[in-house]
Amino acid sequence: MPCNRAVFGAFVLALLISLQSVYFKLYEFYKNNETARNTSVAGFLKRHEVAVNVIVEFSFDILFFLCGLLGFELSPTARRLIFRRTASAEKADTVELEHVSSRRRNDSRDDSTVRNVSKTSPLASQRSRDHFDGDPREPAPPAYSPADFYPPPASPHICETPLSTRVAPSAPSASLFTAGGIGLP
């Protein structure tokens, strides 16, 4: 559910911001506090200050990026690319087939071709229909037609050429500038 994912992403983001704030407070404490200067942590921070800052900032950036992915609803293609080998991709990318019980649809012992198939999958147009859908020799129509991916032809009133020739505007005259008080010679 996108709402739950977005709420979870916001929660994780709040935790990350709190964790980053705690890191900066501890860093300032060990760097500036007189009693903590003689500890091994303060010595390590002093010797490797730039490296520690770069590594910590980079890791927080990666965590913020991954947390941001939680809040976005990914397209089916992006889900397949990112979660290609996980079961969550199959679960998130399936289509409920009508007139077939879920037990029959997901039965691994069944040899029929009734399975969960993505709308955008090439298999959606190539799979043969079973006896629930009609003639088994008739191929299923494609999920999307090619016309969905190409722009429609332009309307004639948009591409109309004017009957009169157009003249390019000329450069402004000097009198235009002197009238405004610029005072060009």
UniProtKB/Swiss-Prot annotation:
Cellular location(s): Host membrane
Chain intervals with Polar residues compositional bias: 114-126
First-listed, main subcellular location of the protein, grouped into a coarse class: host cell
Ranges of Pro residues composition bias in the record: 139-155
GO CC aspect terms: host cell membrane; membrane
Membrane topology: Single-pass membrane protein
Superkingdom per UniProt: Viruses
Keywords (A to Z) from UniProt: Host membrane, Membrane, Signal, Transmembrane, Transmembrane helix
Residues of the signal peptide: 1-24
Keyword Metal-binding among UniProt keywords: no
Transmembrane annotation, as ranges: 50-70
Comp. bias intervals (Basic and acidic residues): 96-113, 127-138
Region annotated Disordered, chain positions: 96-185
Name of the featured protein: Uncharacterized protein VP12
Lineage: Viruses, Riboviria, Orthornavirae, Duplornaviricota, Resentoviricetes
